[in-house]
Amino acid sequence: MKLIKAIIRPNKLEEVKDALTRLSISGMTVSEVRGHGRQKGHKAIYRGTEYSVTLLPKIMIELVLPDEVVDETIKTIIETARTGEIGDGRVFVLPIDHGYNIRTGERDMV
């Protein structure tokens, strides 16, 4: 099992969710996050005053999946979320040993 963490642009969330649904992936956690990489923020003007926005809004999608669907899932996320511009996001893959169902206390197999 793997934990996939995809950090994407907020305006790409619905497209990515739809693409994952077409892969029959239904379980996911979606969080609003802030951060920056190479993009390093931007300048904004509010009521005539310029200020720096250094932490940009992003969406983080987390999925726990069997190993055999990880590569196709990553490919789908990248193809769907990509605009070709700096700030498109990142995908991280981490190993998962096991999980537990909180309601039943049973050890889960994804």
Predicted regions and their residues:
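Positively charged, small/polar-rich N-terminal and surface patches that mediate targeting and assembly
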Residues: 1-110
